[in-house]
Amino acid sequence: MGNRAILAVDAGGTSIKYSLVSNDTLDQLTEEHFFNMPSSGTKEELMGTFAAVLEGAMEQSRKIDCTIASTAFSVPGPFDCKNGISLMPHKWAAVKGVCLPEEFERMNILPPHIPTYFLHDVHAFLVGEKFFGAAANHTNTLGIIIGTGLGVGVWENNDLGLDENGNPLYSIFKRPFREGILEDYVSGRAIREAYRCVTGLSHDAKTIEIAARNGDDVAKKVYRDMGTILGENIRDIVERHRIECIVVGGRVSLAFDLYQDALCEAVGHGVTAYASKLLESAAMRGVAAWSVHCQKNK
């Protein structure tokens, strides 16, 4: 076969998608293909979905005359990314503790003994934005995902900041804050709850965003306050890693302009902050780039 390709996979709690990416140029070689992910299913159902992804990728590789030379997965956490083992008690519970690379080898679908990489989803997002997106012209960068939850990743000195399992250095979502944890105050549900406490109305974050854009002062303050809280709680990370750029993804990033100034003011240090440029494609672009980065830095 001709070109070498990376099988880039974005595996979430409820869906999974893949694409083939050039190992040389990191250009996308195929369109994205989507599958439902049976998060609460049996081991057989979950592994069957992974098998469908691998079989689909092999079929695509034959169509475009390329060889799959590595695989790279963006995954939720907690996850042992070094060994490819899910540690999640709720999502994919039936494969908790299972070594996925060994399962893939036993399927005998992909070429044998190709390298397989796993990357926490916030890191996949960060690498995508660092190589191809909003942070491309910066060095030390902090990636933040705000959606149903809260996650951060650090890119410093041309590499990811990783813990012993290959995960993000900081689990700021569970930092104690006020009457709970930080995620209670910086997330989609935090926006809903803050607005409800003042107005008595139960709206989702998108509705509150629209209200803010239409002049609702309470809605605008809710977003500004979230930006301030986030900025104050990441300032120590920014200082420790000499961060010069912050890039924010996740669903709440779609309202980024409503809290950007408050975030930057709270962080200080002249740090620049951007909303995601790549949006839903950041993770797959990121894991493909990470695969090449790892191969070059063995």
Where are these regions (language model features)?
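Conserved phosphate-binding loops in N-terminal lobes of ATP-dependent enzymes
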Residues: 3, 7-75, 82
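Glycine/GP-enriched mid-protein hinge/lid loop-to-helix segment characteristic of carbohydrate kinases
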Residues: 5, 19-21, 30, 42, ...
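Glycine-rich phosphate-binding/hydrolytic loop that grips phosphoryl groups
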Residues: 6, 117-130, 258-298
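A short acidic Gly-Thr/Ser loop motif
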Residues: 9-15, 144-149, 251
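Adenine-nucleotide phosphate-binding core of ATP-dependent small-molecule kinases
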Residues: 38-64, 179-181, 192-258, 272-283
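Glycine-rich phosphate-binding loop and adjoining helix at the ATP-binding site
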Residues: 39-40, 47-51, 66-71, 77-140, ...
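Stable alpha-helical structural segments in soluble proteins, enriched in small hydrophobic residues
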Residues: 53, 57-61, 126, 134, ...
